[in-house]
């Protein structure tokens, strides 16, 4: 259990550090989801409760939110805590759906769902009244706009797709 928690923390920290402009570690975003993907696979192989995937995704995205949007506390501490919590609750959902798809339908469909769920969630996050558009995966390159001049054609969602696919490729290369 502690090992699984460590992988959640690692994924959250890698994601968070890939957004920090001061150190410009954006390449970390290309491997940040790999520990979570490994963790999800362990939960699936060990036939553990699917709720564990949700809990671990919540840990990943709580850390990610705290590292990237810590500055919200300057406005109000309670507002920051609510933003951290509710954003993590929502972002964990597509990762849980990915796990359920893998578990009940199959691996291939699960990995397709992984891509679709994340991109669909990001689209919904842009277009609902409580929009929180700061943290799509494609925004990891904000400190290096020269890397993403092609966003002119694809938007940030193209960058998110890039990040998701590279994480999957790295994961399959490691596993």
Per-segment meaning from a language model:
Residues 1-175:
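Membrane-embedded alpha-helical bundles of multi-pass enzymes
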